[in-house]
């Protein structure tokens, strides 16, 4: 039997040069799993806790030796002898060992590393791909990539308020072609920006981070790049935005301060603005359009745009079934962003995806801005037939690692692989 004989964590670096947790799980059969934990820059206040050491003399306080020690000294002894294929039981033990609502004792970064490494070891023992282990034989849907090609907000050092402007190749016949389309548009955008004398350095997620005259100029420039690449905006390629509005929401006056444009808006004015942008550009998805605590604003946005635009809750729902349940009950949003480190275990992650699907919400599997070479989220996207993945631009190895894994999975699935394109938006009246 694949009993766990050793669990070992170490401190490694993520794509921003900050420490993160890597966990290895060994079994008596020789099966092995390794996982690396991502980290966010714009984080929701209700996310599970990521433990940092706080020692300013070491990695500017961002070390994770406390989380590493929690794995090696507290979690590891408790897991010895466990059957590594008992994912639910392992995750439940991790939750109980922590004993807090927000994983604040052991750290979500410690717990998630163990949860993912166990799943990889189990797949290794069974000699099957990770997506098949996690999802079963019916795991066959390749996701539409949501590719962040213009970065702003907390992800870039520029004057753009909206955090992410993305393209979605909904008209592609398969994932391989979707990735090709995205890559060609990415390179087309670089030439468009260069021709305008704009910066073509990239941000945390691989997208370009130029200073622009307005947030709307980002949309105009992307549409120009799509056309220059030979594709049709609105037909073959849709646009998506992640406003990450909590980052420019002012709690004191309850308004949204778009400092890049020198504009201050109320919730209702933000909704009006989004409605105007949707009428002018082929936008199919808006994430965190309002602050995570502005539920009235989110409800208004859903009433106005929820039938024709995917409204994704990230900071709003934080991959948490309690928060998602509240949103479903109150008619807020129609989609959830899934980030494994927001909740801390694979079991809880899959629970959130299931709840979303039962309610007719879509689930978008997502990376974090601080990433690694770990490609687990690519397998999760296929395992759950989620239909959408958000993992940055086709640039930087930490992003491309996920896309390359999806190419491998599509090859493995061969003729059984499916790519639903525009039909991935089953929550909209198309």
From Swiss-Prot:
Its main location: cytoplasm. Covalent binding to the substrate (probably 2-PG) at Lys-339 of a small fraction of enolase causes inactivation of the enzyme, and possibly serves as a signal for the export of the protein. Citrate acts as a non-competitive inhibitor for both forward and reverse reactions, probably by chelating Mg(2+). This is Enolase. It is found in: Cytoplasm; Secreted; Cell surface. The active site is at residues 205, 339. One of its GO terms (biological process) is sporulation resulting in formation of a cellular spore. SMART domains: Enolase_C, Enolase_N. (2R)-2-phosphoglycerate binds at residues 163, 339, 368-369, 390. Homooctamer. Component of the RNA degradosome complex composed of rny, rnjA, rnjB, pnp, pfkA and eno (although rnjA and rnjB's presence is controversial). The modification Phosphoserine is found at residues 259, 325. Keywords: Cytoplasm, Glycolysis, Lyase, Magnesium, Metal-binding, Phosphoprotein, Secreted, Sporulation. The keyword Magnesium applies. Binds a second Mg(2+) ion via substrate during catalysis.
